């Protein structure tokens, strides 16, 4: 774990170049949260997005082809992106989840959608191959309702532009689709 204050924020051109360098080699993008405090960047993720929307790579080394351990059994050929925060979050029933003392911020949600748009556009990844950790965990049998003690529910629901809670993957893919024409 590193502190964002000790890392250099990435600009979107750096992310575009990393995506170009990985063109045709990425199968999936998985979206997470760190379940820790803002400002903490973990090496399991290729990119981390802090509360203010600034984007960081662990060790200031952005390589989207590097193998990182972010999603059980699905790390090869994939990119992991995490929002910092959601420390002490509680799933409850999904729409009524409590994001804890450090919830996803609007700046983080928009930055994540922009990063997804860049990776999809420049690395040649289909928007249909972008999943939240909750979505892929549900497919693989360790998502909400599975009874698994290691249940993953990252980004199960998020507030949309109208502040209504909606499935997080739908929110993020919808925003990313809009940004793809603008990045």
Task: Walk through the language-model features, giving the residues of each.
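N-terminal catalytic cores of peptidoglycan-degrading enzymes
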Residues: 1-75
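Basic/polar, cationic surfaces and motifs that engage anionic cell-wall
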Residues: 1-23, 86-183
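Short, well-structured alpha-helical interface segments that form or flank functional binding sites
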Residues: 42, 76, 107, 111
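Short coil-to-beta-strand
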Residues: 73-90
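Structural preference for beta-strand elements that scaffold enzyme active sites
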Residues: 28, 78-80, 129-131
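Generic serine detector
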Residues: 34, 48, 69, 76-78, ...
